[in-house]
A protein has these predicted regions:
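Iron-sulfur cluster-binding electron-transfer modules in prokaryotic oxidoreductases
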Residues: 2-293
Length: 293
C-alpha cells in the first residue's frame, strides 16, 4: 500500500514527442526552452526512441515514396513503443508525419514496401499532434508562474503556412488554438496586435535556391508586422524563425521569439538569459530598453 506521502504526490503528465533534426541542431535552444517550459507545466517529455529524419522538403521533393517511408518508420517505432499520441514540434515534420499517416492508411503497396524495409506494416495506431495543442490549455499555469511581466512587448503570432496546407492532409484548424495561444501570450504581459499575415509563407526551403524571392516574402511579413504596431514576432516553426530573422533586405528586421522563450523570460526559467543570445536578430537591445532583461 502506498504511504500517504507518496499518494499525495502529483503525477506528472507524460508526453511523447518526435524531436526532428532542427531541434537537435539549428534550433537547439528552442528545444532547451521547450523542456524547461514543460517542466513548469508538470509534464514529463520523452523522445521517440531511435527516430530518424522525417524527410522534410528535400526528400519528398525528389522521391515522395521514399519520404513517406522515412516518416513511416517513425510511426512504426511509435506503435512498437506503445505511443498513442506523438507530439511534433516542427510544422514541417508535422506535415510529413501526417502525410505518411494518411498515405500508408490508404496505399497498401506503399505500406507493403514499409513492411519489407522495416519488418511490419503500419497499422494506423498513432495520432500525430502539434505541440501547441498542449500549450493552448495551460494559460493559468503560466500566469501563476510570471515573475517578470513582459510589459512593452508587442508580438504578432506567426504560424506560417504548413500547418493548414494541404487541409486534406493536416486536418488542422489553427483558429481555436490561435485564440487560446493569444490569451496565453497575454498573461505573460505581451500585447498581441491583430494582423492578417499569421499564415503567410516565409519562403521555407526556397531560401536556399531562390533567396531573392524569399527576401521579398519576408520583407512583406515584416512590413505588415510593423504596420500592426509589433516590435517582435512570435513564431512556432524553426525554419520560419530562421527565415524571418535572416532573410529580407528592405524592411528593418524584428526579433523573432519562440513562445517557450517568452514563457522562460516571464517565469525566469533556468537558462532563459542564454537562449536570447543565439538569435540572428539580437533581441537584447529591445529587452534591455523595456527593462525585461
Amino acid at each position: 500500500m502506498s504511504s500517504g506521502k507518496s499518494a499525495g504526490k502529483k503525477r506528472l503528465r507524460r508526453v511523447h514527442y518526435y524531436p526532428g533534426c532542427s531541434l537537435m541542431s539549428s534550433a537547439k535552444d528552442f528545444g532547451t526552452s521547450l523542456f524547461q517550459m514543460f517542466r513548469l507545466m508538470g509534464t514529463w517529455v520523452e523522445p521517440l526512441e531511435d527516430w530518424n529524419c522525417c524527410g522534410a522538403s528535400p526528400a519528398h521533393s525528389v522521391n515522395p515514396d521514399y519520404a513517406t517511408l522515412l516518416a513511416g518508420r517513425n510511426l512504426l517505432l511509435a506503435e512498437r513503443q506503445g505511443i498513442d499520441d506523438l507530439y511534433v514540434v516542427c510544422p514541417s515534420c508535422f506535415v510529413r508525419l501526417r502525410t505518411a499517416e494518411k498515405t500508408l492508411s490508404t496505399d497498401g503497396s506503399l505500406n507493403a514496401k514499409l513492411a519489407k524495409a522495416c519488418g511490419r506494416e503500419y497499422e494506423g495506431g498513432v495520432q500525430v499532434k502539434f505541440t501547441p495543442e498542449i500549450l493552448s490549455d495551460a494559460p493559468i499555469v503560466f500566469e501563476k508562474a510570471v515573475m517578470n511581466p513582459l510589459e512593452g512587448l508587442r508580438g504578432v503570432l506567426y504560424f506560417g503556412c504548413l500547418l493548414t496546407r494541404p487541409e486534406w492532409i493536416t486536418g488542422f484548424d489553427i483558429r481555436p488554438y490561435e485564440r487560446k495561444l493569444k490569451r496565453l501570450v497575454n498573461v505573460l504581459g505581451v500585447e498581441t496586435p491583430d494582423w492578417s499575415f499569421s499564415k503567410q509563407c516565409c519562403g521555407s526551403h526556397l531560401a536556399v535556391t531562390k533567396s531573392d524571392m524569399v527576401d521579398g516574402m519576408v520583407d512583406r511579413i515584416r512590413d505588415h508586422a510593423r504596420r500592426a504596431g509589433a516590435n517582435c514576432i512570435i513564431a512556432f516553426c524553426p525554419l520560419c524563425q530562421v527565415n524571418l530573422e535572416l532573410r529580407g533586405k528592405e524592411v528593418e528586421p524584428l526579433p523573432v521569439f519562440y513562445i517557450s522563450e517568452l514563457i522562460g523570460l516571464a517565469a525566469k526559467l533556468p537558462g532563459h538569459e542564454n537562449w536570447v543570445k543565439k538569435h540572428l536578430v539580437d533581441p537584447r537591445p529591445l529587452l534591455s530598453f523595456l527593462e525585461l532583461l
